[in-house]
């Protein structure tokens, strides 16, 4: 990877911080506001420069269409890649691990514990697409608005988390899908982890 300018490094850190805080990248307008640019177009030019250097990928037509790109995918002891999860079984059960991949640890804050292969398009509008690899920090806690990997009864899903008393709402980011409502008094629910980034599922995987 070619060296980044101080401003490019600042933008990259902002993207990582936003992913940490909310589970999604910032918009161009948010970048411009936080870094004092005159317009979102200025932020776009810096993002294009980062894309040319192979640090991010820009997804056209999406206000938050920014993905971090991991370029170190050598098979070795590293983050486990979780594929299809059988109903009722532990997420990190050995039979679910499709491989281990080394990834630059500085890409994610907090650190990723594992990668989850995304199944479906329910989070499409924030750039999480079918077949992508979701970097997940293993935790049982989440704040409202964060993107989580959650287990509802025997099923695992990726959604935006909201809690209202004894009710959990798991919101999709695609109008073709419906919010999942969980009654904690009647249903089994657990947070498996917090989304800390998305990696494009390239041909090397």
Curated annotation (Swiss-Prot):
It catalyses: Hydrolysis of Ala-|-Gly bond in repressor LexA. It is an enzyme of class 3 (hydrolase). The record marks 87-88 as: Cleavage. The gene is lexA. This is LexA repressor. GO terms for biological process: DNA repair; DNA replication; negative regulation of DNA-templated transcription; proteolysis; SOS response. The active site is at 122 (for autocatalytic cleavage activity), 159 (for autocatalytic cleavage activity). Its EC number is 3.4.21.88. It comes from Idiomarina loihiensis (strain ATCC BAA-735 / DSM 15497 / L2-TR). Belongs to the peptidase S24 family. Keywords: Autocatalytic cleavage, DNA damage, DNA repair, DNA replication, DNA-binding, Hydrolase, Repressor, SOS response, Transcription, Transcription regulation. Pfam families: LexA_DNA_bind, Peptidase_S24. Represses a number of genes involved in the response to DNA damage (SOS response), including recA and lexA. In the presence of single-stranded DNA, RecA interacts with LexA causing an autocatalytic cleavage which disrupts the DNA-binding part of LexA, leading to derepression of the SOS regulon and eventually DNA repair. The keyword Hydrolase applies. It comes from the Bacteria.
